């Protein structure tokens, strides 16, 4: 598998990032291990999770990190994995939080659950819109210098706060984000393309879209109203089943048939 570098880092990754929010939610530990084994056997090495996955199950999260940690311990392959996790999301115990206090607490909890001494890529998962950019970046500076994190990245933050982050980092010699994880797929393109794509280019960021399959809609398994009642996620993605969504599915069918592939692969 040909690998590429995440921009402005020495992290080499295969060009598909596995999102681990299903671990401990729709996949139990055994099923998660099977998926991770197949992923690694395919030559892939980039795994993404978050400290709060899946908080909607138990109220606080942590299951995904624990499962990935157990898998790496069993496989003894931590050195082969580029590991990303996140901080800042809400749970039933607290709201969105990227304060220094929360980051310093959360990184240690993530390291313990993952059974590792460092995170390769640490994301601002959500912006709390209260904490100053300088406070957040100074927390990252501290944990990078402590060897707990190698590089930082951003996900659900506004274009304005992303710009401010680079300005503050430059002015105060603080760490800069090296990647952006935007919400982007074939049925939800506009926000990234109009608000973020130019910033990705300006700041030399790598981009790793989440929900690239629109939570499963673009796999093609949802073809009728009844299909949405058959899965845990069906209710939340039924919104895509409109004229636009159906047109995208039709286009995926044509392209996948032409190339003897699957809709999910094309998407």
Predicted regions and their residues:
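Conserved, mostly hydrophobic/aromatic
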Residues: 6, 18, 32, 47, ...
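Short, acidic/polar
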Residues: 27-40, 98-114, 162-167
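Active-site mouth loops of central-metabolism enzymes
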Residues: 20-30, 90-104, 126-131
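N-terminal small/glycine-rich loop or linker at the start of catalytic domains
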Residues: 7-24, 82-95, 118, 123
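N-terminal binding-site loop/beta-alpha segment at the start of enzyme catalytic domains
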Residues: 1-79, 145
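Beta/alpha (TIM)-barrel catalytic core signal, keyed to glycine-rich beta->alpha loops juxtaposed to Asp/Glu
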Residues: 131-267
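Active-site beta-loop-alpha junctions enriched in small/polar residues
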Residues: 21-23, 52, 86-90, 124-127, ...
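Short, well-ordered coil/turn segments that N-cap beta-strands
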Residues: 11-16, 43-45, 77-81, 115-120, ...
């Amino acid at each position: 598998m040909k690998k590429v570098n995440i921009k402005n880092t020495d992290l080499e990754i295969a060009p598909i990032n596995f999102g681990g929010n299903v671990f401990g939610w729709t996949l139990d530990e055994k099923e998660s291990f099977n998926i991770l084994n197949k992923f690694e056997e395919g030559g892939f090495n980039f795994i993404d999770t978050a400290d709060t996955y899946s908080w909607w199950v138990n109220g606080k999260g942590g299951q995904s990190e624990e499962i990935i940690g157990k898998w790496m311990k069993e496989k003894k392959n931590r050195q082969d994995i580029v590991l990303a996790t996140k901080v800042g999301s809400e749970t039933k115990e607290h709201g969105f939080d990227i304060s220094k206090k929360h980051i310093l607490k959360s990184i240690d909890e993530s390291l313990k659950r993952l059974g590792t001494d460092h995170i390769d890529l640490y994301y601002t998962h959500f912006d709390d819109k209260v904490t100053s950019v300088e406070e957040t970046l100074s927390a990252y500076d501290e944990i990078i210098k402590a060897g707990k994190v190698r590089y930082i990245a951003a996900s659900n933050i506004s274009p304005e706060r992303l710009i401010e982050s680079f300005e503050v980092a430059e002015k105060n010699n603080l760490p800069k984000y090296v990647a952006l994880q935007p919400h982007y797929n074939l049925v939800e393109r506009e926000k990234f393309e109009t608000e973020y794509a130019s910033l990705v280019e300006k700041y030399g960021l790598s981009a790793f879209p989440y929900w690239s399959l629109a939570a499963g809609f673009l796999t093609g398994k949802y073809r009728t109203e009844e299909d949405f009642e058959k899965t845990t996620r069906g209710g939340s993605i039924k919104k895509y089943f409109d004229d636009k969504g159906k047109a995208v599915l039709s286009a995926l069918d044509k392209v996948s048939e032409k190339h003897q592939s699957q809709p999910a692969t094309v998407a």
